[in-house]
């Protein structure tokens, strides 16, 4: 049982507010939550917070805060599951979850909340059940066109019409407008991996972790059977390695409840009959052992003179992806000592950009080709830079420098090596139009840290 539900923007502006029981302090509770959230040290706030006799449970999704409050002694895990399900429902019915989308569909969001929760008690979170009661149509920013090549693919990757669907096609509502009789039968399947890496100052690998998901968004009628074929060398745990090759191994794996595993052990095929909307077909994790080299290596060189306050940092970034692959939206973030007053730079290509901001150096590289190597020479004046005793140049890093962190996106690449071999649909619509199938693979950084 929950007392209130509200959605805040990243700046704390209330977008949605619903009081189910009338036992709270009104809209001031949303402001109280954001003050407590921003008053906490660090970037990671706890998902459960308390104030007097009230509990706040929240998740962050697409830059929004989805918050539930209760004064009862309820398991926080059940409320976190409810918030996650609400985020999925909003994405299903509005097309995507974001500040602009919520603002355009306020009436639809309130109608969903009225059907999902009655006096704070959950009635249903099923997309299929709710579609019988929801009357408000979603408001989208523009009509969706599958072959609108002015759009770009997932995470900004350039796409080809015959291979990848524009990103807008996957972000439309699962329920078409009642005036739109041309609802397309489509399935979008994404293999998404988040890479966490920690590299020591001597270049040795201290930690590596891959968190992966196979995400499905289906516009087919509910219960339509589909089969997803994974890489045949895919195995779970070291004891399950098969054949003579290194195999594609993960440490842990979990499946959605709608997945049938009768063909998984023998042929690595997932069979399922999903409902309309979004779901995570499979989650997996891999630690310590990657089948391929890390996507990036950084080779830093530091020279600083305490007497003159001159700091020189030379960074060489090597991309170890295959030559036909590329990384997009690469950004290197390097914390700097306090008091930097000037920056001069020499970059290896004109597309790069570097600037100072919030006590750090930001080096942006829009596109990095696999097998390439880029460099940047940065000279800064730091008066009164603290450090070990002595004058003259030093090759040791001064206090406050580093560690460096990288953010990037790798379209059509998975760090674990897992690939979808095929996506087969048993559904056959009336007429000659076959369902459209879109499969995408991508990896992106989660925490890619290199010590200086």
UniProtKB/Swiss-Prot annotation:
One GO cellular component term noted in the UniProt record for this chain: AP-4 adaptor complex
Classification via CDD domains: AP-4_Mu4_Cterm (cd09253), AP4_Mu_N (cd14838)
Keyword Cell inner membrane assigned: no
Pfam families, alphabetized: Adap_comp_sub (PF00928), Clat_adaptor_s (PF01217)
Top-rank taxon, per record: Eukaryota
Keyword Translocase: no
PANTHER family listed in its UniProt record: AP COMPLEX SUBUNIT MU
Family label: Belongs to the adaptor complexes medium subunit family.
Subunit composition and interactions: Adaptor protein complex 4 (AP-4) is a heterotetramer composed of two large adaptins (epsilon-type subunit AP4E1 and beta-type subunit AP4B1), a medium adaptin (mu-type subunit AP4M1) and a small adaptin (sigma-type AP4S1). Interacts with tyrosine-based sorting signals on the cytoplasmic tail of cargo proteins such as APP, ATG9A, LAMP2 and NAGPA. Interacts with the C-terminal domain of GRID2. Interacts with GRIA1 and GRIA2; the interaction is indirect via CACNG3.
Function: Component of the adaptor protein complex 4 (AP-4). Adaptor protein complexes are vesicle coat components involved both in vesicle formation and cargo selection. They control the vesicular transport of proteins in different trafficking pathways. AP-4 forms a non clathrin-associated coat on vesicles departing the trans-Golgi network (TGN) and may be involved in the targeting of proteins from the trans-Golgi network (TGN) to the endosomal-lysosomal system.
Name of this chain's protein: AP-4 complex subunit mu-1
Taxonomic source organism: Bos taurus
